[in-house]
Amino acid sequence: LINKGIPGIGICLGMQLLLEYGYEGGIKTKGLNLFEGDVKILPKFRKAKIPNIGWSDTVLSRNEEYWQKHLNNAFYYVHSYFVKLSNQEEKLATINYAEQLNINVAIYKNKLLGVQFHPEKSQRQGLELIRDYFQFHI
């Protein structure tokens, strides 16, 4: 379906599965290879707790009106891993993790959106993102 341009959203682990490889449990595992890059465990910083749980403001990487409307918000996160993209043009948004590392939290290409946060737990802005994404792309 993805190769036919049908829109989709990968949420949290779903986003991570879109990449080439992941290292959950320290074992290199193949992903769906729809985005170039891999998934790494969050680094241990003094100010950081793993898993990263709670609300964080996104920082947009693209200045497009659609993404400004839908990703320029705070969203709810529960994760221990982060996506490291090879192609930075696919990056939509980041958050600043532990005041030390900007990590990718939204990626996009060919009508496929990946988000590290949980839009279904992110109140109105998360539900609007899901609803409007499919209305816009269908």
Feature names for model-found ranges:
Residues 1-52:
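Cysteine-nucleophile active-site neighborhood
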Residues 3, 37-138:
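Amide-donor transfer/coupling interface in amidating biosynthetic enzymes
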